[in-house]
Amino acid sequence: MNIAIVTINQENAAIASWLAAQDFSGCTLAHWQIEPQPVVAEQVLDALVEQWQRTPADVVLFPPGTFGDELSTRLAWRLHGASICQVTSLDIPTVSVRKSHWGNALTATLQTEKRPLCLSLARQAGAAKNATLPSGMQQLNIVPGALPDWLVSTEDLKNVTRDPLAEARRVLVVGQGGEADNQEIAMLAEKLGAEVGYSRARVMNGGVDAEKVIGISGHLLAPEVCIVVGASGAAALMAGVRNSKFVVAINHDASAAVFSQADVGVVDDWKVVLEALVTNIHADCQ
């Protein structure tokens, strides 16, 4: 089986980490490197079609993200193939893929006979930053073309800062509360040395930054310690913390699903527990 690995602007870490977990024995891998970063898909779609016609591949694999999703879908349409976006794994013998559905509550196994099969990867937490692509692959460079005529202007946003949540070693995930709780939550998190994230339901209550959402529609994290408080354990939220090394769940409902996904669970009012934890930490430090 011939597989084309598409990377964009030498950002290889996510796709390289995913490849390392797959078994591609018996496959011929090629590396299609798009560089520099295109602004819109139209700059590279024609070139991708031409490249596939010169060196056909059974599977064309794109990196995670909205741009990878778009290229996968539109290239498959142009080549009369099939596209599946945000896959988590690929089984070579059956050419079947797995991906999450229904807010991460279900894992689906999908299969199609159409070729080429264009795939984009699901976002991953904790991808090794120094992961490298397999050696020995044929590399083919794809240079983006001119911007399309319909694109009147573009703006390049400089100095976009990365949210501290993405690199935090300790994270406090809050699922309940309202705007009145924000100051107390921030104080507790600071004393715990943790960054704060929120469930989507909590963000919808207002008063917190929507960029702090944890889960499939927000951050996917892999901290050393994650404390989840006041959250039932919905699959969409827990997808954002499932790669944590150690998970503590605090909830007053002993039957909450969050406890089945935690290393340690405490059934109590979460504010009381966090305040006691802060007190004990500071007592031990004295």
UniProtKB/Swiss-Prot annotation:
UniProt-recorded Gene Ontology molecular function terms: electron transfer activity; flavin adenine dinucleotide binding
UniProt binding sites for FAD: 225-253
Domain of life: Bacteria
Record InterPro entries: DHS-like_NAD/FAD-binding_dom, ETF_a/b_N, ETF_a/FixB, ETF_asu_C, Rossmann-like_a/b/a_fold
Alphabetical keyword list: Electron transport, FAD, Flavoprotein, Transport
The keyword Electron transport is annotated on this UniProt entry: yes
An example Gene Ontology biological process: fatty acid beta-oxidation using acyl-CoA dehydrogenase
Known function: May play a role in a redox process.
Subunit record text: YgcQ and YgcR form a heterodimer.
Family recorded in the similarity comment: Belongs to the ETF alpha-subunit/FixB family.
Protein's name according to its UniProt entry: Putative electron transfer flavoprotein subunit YgcQ
The organism of origin for this protein: Escherichia coli (strain K12)
